[in-house]
């Protein structure tokens, strides 16, 4: 048999095997597209990532990061996002939240930190004219910045023999080094800074991360409080980008003097 007729005979079976016969057909449940019968589109939180439904006919919103997804009526997630199941809650079974496929914070070319590359892309699409040039990822991880004192040490008034502490809360990237120093006055009248705790057996310094991301909190504990502990205490934070400092004052009243002052007050005034 000539080759050409044989090839023509084999084409129908090849088409069935490769699924070419169904190519171009719509989903079995889809009717001919009539866009005038499409439901009124609801306002999309991110209209630039809208798409068509499964039948390729009616406009449909794609979920932005954090939007509900999945289930019979849930939206599809936008590009770069995946639908992750919820850990718990009252949400319908089979639904989830749109999360970025690439996890981790990033630093944008605008100097701002974004929770994910998807959040950065959303910002770039939302306000393209607000930035000189195209907003893009500058580096993985949050943007670096100099320390900022969020909660400075407060002034303290107390009597000798008690326990007191000063705290200092700082935010910075990378993590700063926090030190405590006390203003010292020499007999000649000059001022200097003494790094603590030094040789003081009644002073301890502690540092821990938190309470939030990129924050560090440090305490200086004085126990027992002595009259010579009175003065100004500086909280100093520094990293590779810069430094910041704040201070608090400790005022100490001698306990014996306090008792004598208290006992000298007439009874009718107490």
Curated annotation (Swiss-Prot):
Ranges of residues in domain Ig-like C2-type: 147-251
Q: Which InterPro entries match?
A: Growth_fac_rcpt_cys_sf, Ig-like_dom, Ig-like_dom_sf, Ig-like_fold, Ig_I-set, Ig_sub, Ig_sub2, IGFBP-like
What does the UniProt entry say about where the protein is found? Secreted
Disulfide bridge positions per record? 30-55, 33-57, 38-58, 44-61, 69-83, 77-98, 107-143, 168-235
tRNA-binding as UniProt keyword:
no
| Pfam families registered for this protein in UniProt | I-set, IGFBP, Kazal_2
Cellular component GO terms, alphabetically?
extracellular space
UniProt feature coiled coil, ranges: none
Q: What is this protein called?
A: Insulin-like growth factor-binding protein-like 1
Q: At the top level of its lineage, which domain of life is listed?
A: Eukaryota
Location of the IGFBP N-terminal domain: 26-101
Which organism encodes this protein? Mus musculus (Mouse)
Q: Which GO terms describe its biological process?
A: cellular response to tumor cell; regulation of cell growth
- Major localisation: secreted
Query: Which residues bear sugar attachments?
Result: 158
Describe the function of this protein. IGF-binding proteins prolong the half-life of IGFs and have been shown to either inhibit or stimulate the growth promoting effects of the IGFs in cell culture. They alter the interaction of IGFs with their cell surface receptors.
Q: Which UniProt keywords apply?
A: Disulfide bond, Glycoprotein, Immunoglobulin domain, Secreted, Signal
Which ranges carry the Kazal-like domain?
A: 87-145
């Amino acid at each position: 048999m000539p080759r050409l007729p044989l090839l023509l005979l084999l084409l129908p079976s090849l088409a069935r095997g490769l699924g070419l016969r169904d190519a171009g057909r719509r989903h079995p449940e889809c009717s001919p597209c009539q866009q005038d019968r499409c439901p009124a589109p609801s306002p999309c939180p991110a209209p630039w990532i809208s798409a068509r439904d499964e039948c390729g006919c009616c406009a449909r919103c794609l979920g932005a990061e954090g939007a509900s997804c999945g289930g019979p009526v849930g939206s599809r997630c936008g590009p770069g996002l995946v639908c992750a199941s919820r850990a718990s809650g009252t949400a319908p079974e089979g639904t989830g939240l749109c999360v970025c496929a690439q996890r981790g914070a990033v630093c944008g070319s605008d100097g701002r930190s974004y929770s994910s590359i998807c959040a950065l892309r959303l910002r770039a699409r939302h306000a393209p004219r607000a930035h000189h040039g195209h907003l893009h990822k500058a580096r993985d991880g949050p943007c670096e910045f100099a320390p900022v004192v969020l909660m400075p040490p407060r002034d303290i008034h107390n009597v000798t023999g008690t326990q007191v502490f000063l705290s200092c809360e700082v935010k910075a990237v990378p993590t700063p080094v926090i030190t405590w120093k006390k203003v010292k006055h020499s007999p000649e009248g000059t001022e200097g800074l003494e790094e603590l705790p030094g040789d003081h057996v009644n002073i301890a310094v502690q540092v821990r991360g938190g309470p939030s991301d990129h924050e560090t909190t440090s305490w200086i504990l004085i126990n027992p409080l002595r009259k010579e502990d009175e003065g100004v205490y500086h909280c100093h934070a520094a990293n590779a980008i810069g430094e910041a400092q704040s201070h608090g004052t400790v005022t100490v009243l001698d306990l014996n003097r306090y008792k004598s002052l208290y006992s000298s007050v007439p009874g009718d005034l107490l």
